[in-house]
Design a protein with these regions (language model features):
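N-terminal Rossmann-like dinucleotide-binding module
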Residues: 1-48
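A short helix->loop->beta-strand "cap" motif at the edges of active sites that frequently abuts
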Residues: 50, 85-87, 112-115, 206
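Hydrophobic residues in well-ordered beta-strands that form the structural core
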Residues: 54, 91-92, 116-118, 142, ...
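C-terminal helix-rich "cap/oligomerization" subdomain common to oxidoreductases
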Residues: 65-68, 203, 283-320
């Protein structure tokens, strides 16, 4: 396979990002896009000079790979049709809205020797890649992901929309099974979960606190890790990572007053600022063309979804 023919199904905000990156990748030909919104589809097609279709089945026989960025409720049916047609699939997160459908998709992909990649783009953030080199024995992990409300995502609440990014990173960072989950949630601007705090306790005694909100007036995306010998702070947006280490501390008696003095060392880690989506699509294409191994195992993909769904189940039970 000298050149890869690619298509994109669903060119909303995320889908358009895929179109833009695929159009620039070497040895990739953008063969077509699919969009049900005629006005939106024509606009993207003209901008990138690519054929447009209204039925995704029209891409069968025209593409080797496809990026699917449709609403989550449509993921299973659309992805399954492409896999059954022998086409490699990059499916935007979350994989599906239930575990059984996700398992079936991976089984079909394996049976047909096809690549099924789930779009967890934060894995390809340069700061996250450095984080996995630094963190070895986490004690406590705290994630904060806040942004203003937008009606861009109408089908999913904040758990499947954005919290799943942090769930995925946390599980792969801690590398232990979740034994207990506590969840608090609130609906603010929609009928679904707009603000969720999930506390996860792991088999190895590590604890994670994950906050996801689309009810904030500012945008914050950070992850902090406490280890015995360091405190690591990661900023997803700026792609920066800092390591704090305590160098000394002492109590001082001055004029009858007891004062505490602490000195810390702060190390800023060099992080490449490459486009995470570009790196993700390059990895996907490499898996397809060269048979390169996936960076994340199927079991890990499914476990991230399982924990996200467990959190949603707790939210539903609390509302009854």
């Amino acid at each position: 396979m000298s050149r890869v023919k690619a298509g994109v199904v669903g060119v909303g905000k995320m889908g358009e990002y895929h179109v833009g990156v695929l159009a620039e990748l070497q040895k990739v030909d953008l063969a077509g896009i699919v969009e049900s919104n005629e006005k939106r589809g024509k606009s993207i097609a003209q901008r990138y000079e690519v054929p447009i279709f209204t039925d995704y089945r029209e891409l069968f026989g025209k593409v080797d790979v496809v990026s699917i960025a449709v609403p989550t409720a449509q993921h299973y049916a659309v992805a399954m049709d492409f896999l059954n047609s022998g086409i490699h699939v990059l499916l935007e997160k979350p994989c599906t809205n239930n575990l059984k459908d996700a398992q079936e998709l991976f089984k079909v992909a394996e049976k047909k020797n096809l690549t099924l990649h789930i779009g967890h783009v934060e894995r390809f953030n340069g700061a996250v890649q450095e984080l996995f080199k630094i963190v070895t024995e986490p004690i406590f992990v705290e994630c904060t992901r806040m942004s203003p409300f937008t009606d861009r995502i109408k089908g999913d609440g904040v758990v499947l929309d954005v919290m799943i990014h942090d769930i995925d990173i946390v599980l792969n960072l801690i590398k232990s099974k979740v034994v207990k989950t506590n969840v608090l949630s609130s609906t603010v601007f929609s009928e679904r979960d707009d603000l969720v705090v999930a506390q996860l306790q792991f088999e190895n005694n590590c604890i994670a606190n994950i906050l996801a909100s689309r009810a904030s007036q500012n945008k914050v995306r950070t992850l902090e890790v406490t280890q015995k010998d360091s405190y690591v702070v990661l900023d997803y947006t700026d792609q920066e990572i800092y390591i704090h280490r305590q160098s000394s501390s002492e109590h001082q008696l001055s004029k009858g007053a007891l004062r505490y003095k602490q000195e810390s060392l702060i190390e800023r880690i060099f992080v490449h600022k490459d486009n995470p989506l570009k790196l993700e699509l390059q990895h996907f294409i490499d898996c397809v063309k060269n048979g390169s191994p996936r960076k994340v195992a199927v079991d890990s993909e499914l476990y991230s979804l399982q924990i996200a769904l467990d959190i949603l189940d707790q939210i539903k039970k609390q509302k009854k």
